[in-house]
């Protein structure tokens, strides 16, 4: 069985196994990739040498004195040497050198940057260490001792590379090498498009040793001292800050947290003092400042203040004459008397803090002082393995050049000078960001806080916004800059995107142990040209980038950017935790702040606002901290109501903005709710002012869990230290999703408008500010509350997915908008005269009340959510803590509906809601309201009067019973998940997509309505959550779980359908019953597969496998294929949705099995040899008794008394589904069953036989035969004699493009012949009329004018072409993948297109696809979907994995394959290669070409991607896309390669035939020398795959002898061989 044939590597064949250690999540990964021999370095090239040569080549390349270390400023970490570092690099340094200390004789060295850098260079060795897959160190790169050469390039500009000889070297050293070689490497990032190319971040040694240079950063209010200037702080210059209490003239001012004057502490020797205090320090809370207007002061612009703490800064004054205040230098701290600094030789004299280097100093000597990006080429197994291409410097002025003008020019606030004394505090307020409180960002440090140099015209008494300095005197200005400390806080987190390298900043600071305030202020970008020979460096402040995230839906807030006003007077900074690709989007995460240490007391804040008008658009005076708002109100303004935005007519620019962030607001809020918000302002300010209050429509884009700074539910106070000091607590996580394409393409220079203001229109502002023009629906960046892997575009809000969610009818299985909570099937229960189930499990009538409920997303709101969250509960100011929800409205269902039990009399039909009632077609009871109005039922409308709750019919409900949920599981509370669940009911809410997926996990909490009366009321004791408690009686398992969202099944996974039976040969449709279920194969085929994971273990990763074809996009969701037709033209007013079963043949596509919870039997999906996705259904195990009963067609009692464990607990099983086990019951008799567990048993097979009570309207709507008949009638085809089109039998109808509307299609009588009564009256489909267009199927050709002339979508039976993959879409209802596509808008298809795509509503713009070599296929498909591998045999399907591909009909799908090259069960890794069949004849491949290995070869398809999804924050996890990292699900390997080849098949492969051929010749002997972890598996692969059977022609051209010790160097075509150079010895 094991073949041992040995074959040597041929000349024209070489193999590289890139040994790269995988991430912590995936373990070790073996990756194989094969390319042609060529002389230039392409993206796809790897080299490979035998592992036993590695030791020889790298002998003595390791310096044993160097040990790993970690640079704390970035996310780079030197992981343990166990193969876990995914970049195969680590930072190492010599720790034998002693730390830098400053004695009395070395003070000039210590404080002179140049001498300091020179002294540090001689002290310690820093290097990079390369590792192989097994964690073995290969060699060190010590740049200080390296004499590198730049690589040579060919005529196309590509790096010259030979897999064995290595890089061609030019003999020239890189430019400025001598200036940068002594810098410290602190981070490495691998280019995703080139496995040999790395970006190395180098920083000066002063950065690494900053804290040891005795230059601690001390700021005002950092800590309290006793006022004496004699205490020491060990080796650290702790710049002292005097206690504000020491100023007797300022007795009212306190630093919260300072116990007394004598409570100050000093840090221990050698210990650094952090803001907020280290151990032993007293934490300094925010400074309180009180302002109060005199009661008799007139509102004349010059107000008199009764109390004005703002008039005095928290520092001591030496003199006070008039309005001129002189600050003394000793207010800023004292240096140690034993260590004077340059410029001040007087021991003990005060020394204002200055940065280590100013911005201009860094700029003038970039090679020495800036951070440098070094482009390193490194191929571990080549002879010339290392080359350094170029060095680029991150100029701080590239960032400051794009600062807003308000940051570069000191000025007063735009709103004028209100209080002359306040000028003392607002010293040179540069964008509300002054050097006194934030000296790190000012070149002069604390020295510029001296208001002698304000440069302001103090004689200007007009109080206008002409507060700029009189002369452009740079000496007097203090613009926000980027000096040394703040600059290096901005270095870190290297991220490649295309030819752009983005530097987002670090999560710490060079002064981290002393101070945590300096953070990243923006992002640097190094953009290389196509060949990498030149680069440009630019930077954008986060203030600019994040201001692009605005609310587009509300007119009142259009001009308010995120976290800024129109003049960019706020300076957001960010501690970047990491940047990574999630899917195709770039997610930036960290903490963001605009923190300051001064706050304004809550009670006096409103006085300050209304009387002094000192507030600029929501940011109070000195309020530099970021006022983030949560779903529960302002994070730091809990006193403010969350309901309105007030804009006074008299002060339109000055009033604060208040945000109503109730998630349930719609575009048209209810007027009485608006009135409720306005009333407090009316009472206080009068109606004239209140008329300018507008509701804010929550857009769902940001400020959910991201900004939950203060937890109002637990009454946890907002931490002043947290807000002000940029703490790293996880609840401050900030996540922004950036569009990397636009980010990489932004211009180098930002253009601002007049006076730095925004344009009047937000889109004009975009063009003016960024000089780019994104389309209306694609803001170039947006927030996401969760790091979602499921996204349909740059802006999830308003995306196509959201449109689908608006359309999809959410399905309940009985009891208006909810479940029959007792789990009683009315077929097995007696019927009352009203048609209601009595709850007794016996059958007398055989009817069923399980009627699906169709509605729009807004159903399920039992209470008035708008009034609930926006009413009186939100208007409390200063009273008791605001409750989250009104007690009267706790009957909310979390996005689904509620249960309305029987009326007390038992005769009413209150609880049995027919489809006509749910859709508003008739009236029920005594109320006739709008369609689908939840309040139309009397007992559902609960009002509150005092403490009593009353239903509309007057029956009082005990408050405690009605509202108290006593049986909730311990991990759920009534409010814990309500924000998420409530947003599920909203239109245009980004979280709805997440809940769409979370429904599959069953993780959304379910709250049960307590309404009703008497014994029929749902009791608290009935709220059973534990399956084990009720496993004997499933009728009591009343709360749905595991995929059921409050009784609403996910429409993408299930269908509501009617099984139909022709009874008695009458040809009439006499019996029908609705059901919900999945499709399974109806034929007796063996759907055998290995269960990889339980079908219930859904994760967002299961939603994916995106396939784009023309104007159609599809993705797989479980066992279903969801297709959006006309995906790229959503503006046309229609949207198609098609659900196709993946596991049934076309002929049996409509076969359904009905069950309340069909997913319980789903066991996973797989791919057969034809590439079809098939599913495994464990129907025998779960519903065997019910299936047996139905198949026997007689009254039978279930034989299985012991139910299996809950489906989620079922372990891995292998099941064979045989259709013969589910023979439908065709008897016309009544079936009686005492089914005691309807939740775990099959209700009915496809064909059921009895139903005496049914809503005919719903039946007619859902009957597929009748729908098809109506469709044929609508399109003028013969509906009586013409046979059914094959396509109508096999596909779900698609909402298409024809004129008309949905209601007109389905109106009129049914065509079944047996329907009667209301069945002929049509159905009002107003709830689903949001999507216009005909309900059209895939119809055959017709000459009717309403359809195109070619609609023949029947499967092609002539060519024998199998339907392959999940993306097999018919070409006629979607544009073929040709060169031109009209009307493209920016969607994920932008990855395929040249240019911006269609951006206007008028006129199509022809857009061409990119050439195949430019298309990054893997960036289109980022979601693993299906399990492919049999864990027993390791390899499946002749060692070739069928692809999920969507290819034109002209291409034989058998001509593309994915070959398994290696598999390792120990490390759970896989090596794959994509291959394309090239026949011998030079013809374009098509279906007529026979795929015969004897007539052609499978060649590697070299269309590697340029960019790939990243999976970890580690900068080394920048995998090339052609290196396929695996997502491991222990204990089974799970991988999917989702590739669309429709655009790539057209490559003239025959032209590159010789260049693409790759053969394999591996002997068992050579495999045996691999590491123990992979060797045996490789051997098994070779034996099973026959890799050793290399193509004969390749063997013939091989000149190597078998068993050659080393493969020879392949010759260069058309060029003489270069001399073979011996491997260089490490320096």
UniProtKB/Swiss-Prot annotation:
Residues 282-297 have a biased composition (Basic and acidic residues). One of its GO terms (biological process) is adhesion of symbiont to microvasculature. GO terms for cellular component: attachment organelle; cell projection; cell surface; membrane; plasma membrane. Residues 1604-1627 have a biased composition (Pro residues). The keyword S-adenosyl-L-methionine does not apply. Induction: Expressed at high levels in all growth phases in vitro (at protein level). The chain crosses the membrane at residues 1527-1547. Residues 219-238, 252-355, 898-953, 1274-1362, 1589-1627 are annotated as: Disordered. Residues 261-276, 1341-1352 have a biased composition (Low complexity). Residues 1-59 form the signal peptide. It is a single-pass type I membrane protein. Residues 1307-1320 have a biased composition (Gly residues). Keywords: Cell membrane, Cell projection, Cytadherence, Membrane, Signal, Transmembrane, Transmembrane helix. Residues 224-234, 903-933, 939-953, 1274-1297 have a biased composition (Polar residues). Pfam families: Adhesin_P1_C, P1_N. InterPro entries: Adhesin_P1, Adhesin_P1_C, P1_N. Belongs to the adhesin P1 family. The protein is the major adhesin mediating the attachment of this mycoplasma to respiratory epithelium. This is Adhesin P1. It comes from Mycoplasma pneumoniae (strain ATCC 29342 / M129 / Subtype 1). The lineage of its organism: Bacteria, Bacillati, Mycoplasmatota, Mycoplasmoidales, Mycoplasmoidaceae. The gene is mgpA.
